[in-house]
């Protein structure tokens, strides 16, 4: 498909919310029906998010007609050619109307009531009584109407799915006079579908709860007046006023005030973060302390929380490898069950003199056992639950495929700067070595000189001066010069001062540059610090060390990864060998690669993949973007603060720390284990039930209970992923 055609289709994409999906098969059928609508070029259902993307033109009425088999309700979320999508609260576009249980399942309740009266009549009047039979027939017709409606259509089209199996089984049971069991099959199948829908709704709740995090209105100052307006009407550049205890409604930058903001909704951090002027704040976070004024930087549809919701919903719709296997398996599984059921019903009576009633009954039971409900939902509920749980805890997983891949990772490569370290250099050591100069005076001279340099570590020295209230702007510097590869020099009050490496002072032949002093400098360098000497042509005045501080969590994270069985942890950095070794040894990585350019990091990741197959790379998503893209799973940090991180990586840690990484690994592994357990259990219980055919013990009761039991247990097992905690 040409790029122009793809772009045209994207421009014609309409997004609709869908209410009423009961199973993944129904979602697939709805997608097929929508594709047949004239004017529709393509359609893609996102079962996890309960949405459909329609490429082309189709009315809501046409879409609902395509979903009439399941009584689906459709509402537009984003229509083509609309630059801004505004959905107010009163549209209820994102929320299903809450219907009372008795109304939502009225037919099921009435059919169940008829069964109860049917069994009462059975005990009072007997099995062959007309009243008894009519009560069971009434239950079958009322409770199974929607089932038969779809089942007959599928049968005519030779489209074999679970509803086709159930329809044939119920009709067959009624033909051979098993009214009571046929009605039980109908009711229990309806209950199974209701439970399946409930399970999916529960797993979607984590994302729906994110939608309600950010306030729909905000206090904004316009033309000197403070007014409360809807977030859809707030423009970039508006000043929003947020009082203590209020949630922040929009993304922006603080222009006035100080506060502590709880960012748990976005980053998963439980500890409030201090915020001051020029700091960024996000919609959905809680202003805990001071009153702040925020300049809006993004429209409501572009806020970080909106992007998270959108990406998570897209991720829930992505089919994981396990889901692809299940879908492919189910495609052949259902027809095979139909054939097995036919053979069970026909072969024993024809060739072995068996009773037709007995073996037809056994064949019908095989159809019920063969219903792939549990198998079909084994993966989607797990993926939706896991991705939703991860999002609430500050880990954005962009698809089930990455969730599965992360679970198989045995090697993790870390970019050093901004990942294992904070990425911001700070002054760690400052020692005055000459009694003739005061500490503050010397630091003031150092700062005045560094202020004029282009050295990347100069910002750390200036920041230290500001923190300690050391003035430097009034220091007059003359004849400032950068000494390439050595340091800098300048004249202050008639004295020439030098700041630079030990090599510079060796060349100057400074008298008090001793071997012992040089060893002290090497000790600082071996600690991962950059040591700079300040002095004149005659004497050394002091030494200052600057370093990119290691994150407090880095060492603990590496230990947890090793405990999880990830033995190969590698640090990649452009730093020199000494600095790299100091930091790598401190955090406990198993291998250290230093003095690497971005291309070298990419080449190293490719080399590691050839050796270990599955390699995860974690960085900030900026200068290490090629390596992230080449890895099996690319993980970016600080996703809340940069669009680049979210777009580049397969997984984004929304908070600016590593502590969520072990949680993401544990969650992915648990997801894989639960999916495997679900598939094994769903298939295993059916095999056991089918084996009961051999001695003739399989009944419709056993068949429906095994199917329903498997569905319930698989759903409940999958929902456990919503409770995995970030330890």
From Swiss-Prot:
EC number: 7.2.2.21
Membrane topology per record: Multi-pass membrane protein
Subcellular location: Cell membrane
Catalysed reaction equations from the record: Cd(2+)(in) + ATP + H2O = Cd(2+)(out) + ADP + phosphate + H(+)
Any one Gene Ontology cellular component term annotated for this protein: plasma membrane
UniProt keyword Cell inner membrane, yes or no: no
InterPro entries: ATPase_P-typ_cyto_dom_N (IPR023299), ATPase_P-typ_P_site (IPR018303), ATPase_P-typ_TM_dom_sf (IPR023298), ATPase_P-typ_transduc_dom_A_sf (IPR008250), Cation_Transport_ATPase_IB (IPR051014), HAD-like_sf (IPR036412), HAD_sf (IPR023214), Heavy-metal-associated_CS (IPR017969)
One Pfam assignment: Hydrolase
UniProt-annotated binding residues for Cd(2+): 23, 26
Induction: By cadmium.
Activity regulation remarks: Inhibited by the antibiotic bafilomycin A1. Partially inhibited by DCCD, nigericin and FCCP.
Domain (HMA): residue spans on this chain: 12-75
PANTHER family from the UniProt entry: CADMIUM/ZINC-TRANSPORTING ATPASE HMA2-RELATED, CADMIUM_ZINC-TRANSPORTING ATPASE HMA4-RELATED
Protein name, entry field: Cadmium-transporting ATPase
């Amino acid at each position: 498909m040409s790029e122009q055609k793809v772009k045209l289709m994207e421009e014609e994409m309409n997004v609709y919310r869908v209410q009423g999906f009961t199973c993944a098969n129904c979602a697939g059928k709805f997608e097929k029906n929508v594709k047949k609508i004239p004017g529709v070029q393509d359609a893609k259902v996102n079962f996890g998010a309960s949405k459909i993307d329609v490429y082309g033109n189709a009315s809501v009425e046409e879409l609902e007609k395509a979903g009439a088999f399941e009584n689906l309700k459709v509402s537009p979320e984003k229509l083509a050619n609309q630059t801004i999508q505004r959905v107010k609260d009163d549209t209820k576009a994102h929320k299903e109307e809450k219907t009372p249980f008795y109304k939502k399942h009225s037919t099921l309740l009435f059919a169940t009531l008829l069964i109860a009266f049917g069994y009462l009549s059975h005990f009072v009047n007997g099995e062959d009584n007309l009243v008894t039979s009519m009560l069971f027939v009434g239950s079958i017709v009322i409770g199974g109407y929607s089932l038969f409606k779809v089942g007959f259509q599928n049968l005519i089209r030779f489209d074999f799915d679970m509803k086709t199996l159930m329809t044939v089984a119920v009709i067959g049971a009624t033909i051979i006079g098993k009214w009571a069991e046929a009605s039980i099959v109908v009711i229990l199948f309806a209950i199974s579908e209701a439970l399946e829908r409930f399970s999916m709704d529960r797993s979607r709740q984590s994302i729906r709860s994110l939608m309600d995090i950010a306030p729909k209105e905000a206090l904004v100052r316009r033309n000197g007046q403070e007014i409360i307006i809807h977030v859809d009407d707030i423009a970039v550049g508006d000043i929003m006023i947020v009082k203590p205890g209020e949630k922040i409604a929009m993304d922006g930058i603080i222009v006035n005030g100080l506060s502590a903001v709880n960012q748990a909704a976005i980053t998963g951090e439980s500890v409030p973060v201090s915020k001051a002027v020029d700091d960024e704040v996000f919609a959905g976070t809680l202003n805990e302390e001071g009153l702040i004024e925020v300049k809006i930087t993004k429209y409501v549809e572009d806020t970080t929380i909106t992007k998270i919701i959108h990406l998570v919903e897209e991720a829930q719709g992505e089919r994981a490898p396990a889901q692809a296997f299940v879908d492919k398996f189910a495609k052949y599984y259902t027809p095979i069950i139909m054939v097995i059921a036919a053979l069970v019903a026909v072969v024993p009576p024809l060739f072995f003199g068996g009773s037709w009633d007995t073996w037809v009954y056994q064949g019908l039971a095989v159809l019920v056992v063969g219903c792939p409900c549990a198998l079909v939902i084994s993966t989607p509920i797990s993926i939706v639950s896991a991705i939703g749980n991860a999002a609430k805890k500050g880990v954005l997983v962009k698809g089930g495929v990455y969730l599965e891949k992360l679970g198989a990772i045995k090697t993790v490569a870390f970019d050093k700067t901004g990942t294992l370290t904070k990425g911001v250099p700070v002054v760690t050591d400052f020692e005055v070595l000459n009694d003739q100069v005061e500490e503050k005076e010397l630091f003031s001279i150092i700062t005045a000189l560094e202020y004029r340099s282009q050295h990347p570590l100069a910002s750390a020295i200036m920041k230290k001066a500001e923190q300690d209230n050391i003035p430097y702007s009034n220091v007059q510097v003359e004849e400032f010069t950068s000494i390439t590869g050595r340091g800098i020099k300048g004249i202050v009050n008639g004295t020439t001062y030098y700041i630079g490496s030990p090599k510079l002072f060796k060349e100057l032949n400074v008298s008090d540059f001793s071997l012992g002093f040089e060893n002290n400098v090497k000790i600082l360098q071996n600690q991962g610090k950059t040591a700079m000497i300040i002095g004149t042509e005659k004497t050394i005045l002091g030494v200052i060390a600057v370093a990119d501080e290691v994150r407090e969590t880095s060492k603990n994270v590496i230990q947890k990864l090793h405990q999880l069985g990830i033995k190969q942890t590698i640090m990649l950095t452009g730093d020199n060998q000494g600095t790299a070794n100091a930091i790598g040894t401190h955090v406990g990585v198993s291998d250290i690669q230093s003095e690497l350019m971005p291309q070298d990091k990419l080449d190293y990741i490719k080399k590691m993949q050839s050796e270990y197959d599955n390699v995860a790379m974690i960085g900030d998503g900026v200068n290490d973007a090629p390596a992230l893209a080449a890895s099996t799973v690319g993980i970016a940090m600080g996703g809340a603060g940069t669009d680049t991180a979210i777009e580049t990586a397969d997984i984004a840690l929304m908070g600016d720390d590593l502590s969520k990484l072990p949680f993401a690994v544990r969650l992915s592994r648990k997801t894989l284990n639960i999916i495997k357990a679900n598939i094994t259990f769903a298939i295993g219980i059916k095999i056991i039930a089918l084996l009961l055919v051999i001695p003739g013990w399989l009944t419709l009761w056993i068949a429906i209970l095994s199917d329903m039991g498997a569905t319930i247990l698989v759903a409940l097992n999958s929902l456990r992923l919503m409770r995995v905690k970030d330890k």
